[in-house]
């Protein structure tokens, strides 16, 4: 008899040796439970959404999240639409090495960029947050973004073909983004 997985082999071997107790049988591993990095929220007046492993720049996402944190939802959506149109630049306060100076920044600082791809994905997440608020009967005009966080996620291995049959290993970056809105009075 051929056994295909290691769990069957272990369980059959233990039963053969007379060790088949519930604590000795290996448990099936679960998927990880991904929570939010903010706690202590009022469940009746808050709404959450998250984007996991998005193919956008973590640096641009951190700067965008820092910019929209504390804004009302319609104001944040307008700002992101203007960033996509290249009308307003996002100030890069943390990742500002070799970043050019911009005149039309979101706040008083010298370095900034127009992170269009990250702004587009964040705009989609804001629309999801708005849909979640409408589903929970919250007023979207009074919804304030109290938590916006971006973290680096897993790397995606990629190959770049080179001459003579060789290839270089590249790593694509992904980002986790969390948004929490609170219905202000």
Describe every region a protein language model picked out.
Residues 39, 148, 182-184:
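Generic beta-structure capping elements
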Residues 30-139, 180:
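Ribosome large-subunit tunnel/peptidyl-transferase-proximal elements
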């Amino acid at each position: 008899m051929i056994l295909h997985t290691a769990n069957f082999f272990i369980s059959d071997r233990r039963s053969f040796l007379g060790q088949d107790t519930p604590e000795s049988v290996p448990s099936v591993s679960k998927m990880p439970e991904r929570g939010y990095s903010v706690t202590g929220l009022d469940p009746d007046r808050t709404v959450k959404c998250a984007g996991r492993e998005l193919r956008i720049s973590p640096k641009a996402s951190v700067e965008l999240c820092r910019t929209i944190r504390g804004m009302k939802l319609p104001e944040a959506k307008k700002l992101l639409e203007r960033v996509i149109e290249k009308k307003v630049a996002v100030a890069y306060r943390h990742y500002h090495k070799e970043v050019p100076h911009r005149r039309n920044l979101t706040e008083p600082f010298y370095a900034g960029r127009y992170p269009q791809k990250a702004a587009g994905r964040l705009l989609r997440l804001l629309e999801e947050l708005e849909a979640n608020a409408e589903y929970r009967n919250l007023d979207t005009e009074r919804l304030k973004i109290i938590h916006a966080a971006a973290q680096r996620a897993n790397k995606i291995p990629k190959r770049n073909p080179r001459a003579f049959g060789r290839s270089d290993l590249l790593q694509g970056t992904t980002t986790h983004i969390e948004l929490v809105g609170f219905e202000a009075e």
